[in-house]
């Protein structure tokens, strides 16, 4: 007769619960240790970026990165409910600012170093799409129709302060 022996697991996996934010997940152990000790802030020299006339920025909306320059058009695959057409948005979740030869990286970068403004050009919908949904071993075909929301932004200002 075969006997089964129960073995206790060596490591237990506990789920991590967190609210939805546009910021990446930060480990609580490292963030509390940083806040308990005095954090040294270093003054970065941003004059090469200030003198550059070709700047780019990577900003995040709903944790999706978008790489833009001044005058670009950004198509967001969702509807921004708070913004109306013609509104000017200040982008604050910028992770990278750079030019052809220099780059400033932070998560996120301090908003006093830059100005990134976008104008809401339009709110529209995608083209009407129909896809066939079937199940195995079943002749029935269901047609799923979708028409997703889009928000179109124009980057109106990108500069270093």
From Swiss-Prot:
GO MF, one annotated term: structural constituent of ribosome
Presence of keyword Mitochondrion: yes
Keywords: Mitochondrion, Ribonucleoprotein, Ribosomal protein, Transit peptide
KW Mitochondrion (keyword) present: yes
Main location: mitochondrion
Superkingdom: Eukaryota
Disulphide-bridged cysteine pairs: none
Pfam families from the UniProt entry: Ribosomal_L21p
Transit peptide interval: 1-35
One annotated Gene Ontology cellular component of this protein: mitochondrial large ribosomal subunit
GO biological process: mitochondrial translation
Localization per Swiss-Prot or TrEMBL: Mitochondrion
Coiled-coil ranges per UniProt: none
Misc: Present with 1850 molecules/cell in log phase SD medium.
Function: Component of the mitochondrial ribosome (mitoribosome), a dedicated translation machinery responsible for the synthesis of mitochondrial genome-encoded proteins, including at least some of the essential transmembrane subunits of the mitochondrial respiratory chain. The mitoribosomes are attached to the mitochondrial inner membrane and translation products are cotranslationally integrated into the membrane.
Family the UniProt entry places it in: Belongs to the bacterial ribosomal protein bL21 family.
Oligomer status and interactors: Component of the mitochondrial large ribosomal subunit (mt-LSU). Mature yeast 74S mitochondrial ribosomes consist of a small (37S) and a large (54S) subunit. The 37S small subunit contains a 15S ribosomal RNA (15S mt-rRNA) and 34 different proteins. The 54S large subunit contains a 21S rRNA (21S mt-rRNA) and 46 different proteins.
Protein name: Large ribosomal subunit protein bL21m
Gene that produces this protein: MRPL49
């Amino acid at each position: 007769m075969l006997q089964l022996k129960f073995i206790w697991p060596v490591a237990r996996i506990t789920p991590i619960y967190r609210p939805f934010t546009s910021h990446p997940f930060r480990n609580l152990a490292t963030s509390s240790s940083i806040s308990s000790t005095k954090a040294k802030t270093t003054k970065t020299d941003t004059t090469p970026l200030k003198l550059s006339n070709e700047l780019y920025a990577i900003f995040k909306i709903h944790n999706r990165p978008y790489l833009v320059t001044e005058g670009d058009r950004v198509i967001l695959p969702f509807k921004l409910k708070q913004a109306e057409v013609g509104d000017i948005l200040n982008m604050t979740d910028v992770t990278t600012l750079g030019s052809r030869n220099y780059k400033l990286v932070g998560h996120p970068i301090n908003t006093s170093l830059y100005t990134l403004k976008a104008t809401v050009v339009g709110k529209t919908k995608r083209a009407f799409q129909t896809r066939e949904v079937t199940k195995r071993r079943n002749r029935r075909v269901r047609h799923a129709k979708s028409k997703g929301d889009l928000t179109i932004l124009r980057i109106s200002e990108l500069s270093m302060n």
